Amino acid sequence: MDKIIECVPNYSEGRNKEVIDLIVKAIADTTVNTERGEERVRVLDVDPGEATNRTVVTFVGSPEAVMEAAFQGEKKAAELIDMRQHHGAHPRSGATDVLPLIPVAGTTLDECAGWARTLAKRIYD
């Protein structure tokens, strides 16, 4: 069985459609080459909230594709969202508040935790 994971990042922008669209595009346009060929993630949902000024994006794919798309989404959010200008009803900690990796098929929570640590290190570096 192929490994499939889900990522549900929360971005600190829920009002500016142009910024939201650019972040989602960065995620959706990401491709990775694996032993199975070129892969992309599938964006399942984009849920902006005006009052909270936050958007939740849901996407799935192989661990390699999800990790790269998550990195590219976080990178684009950090580039476009000015937290000094951010106001919303929901507490926030940065342009990307949370970036969870969730096992869907053929994988475990422990594997997702390892991938999350790898992704966090890449973002930090």
Tell what function each PLM region has:
Residues 1-125:
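Long, contiguous binding/interaction regions
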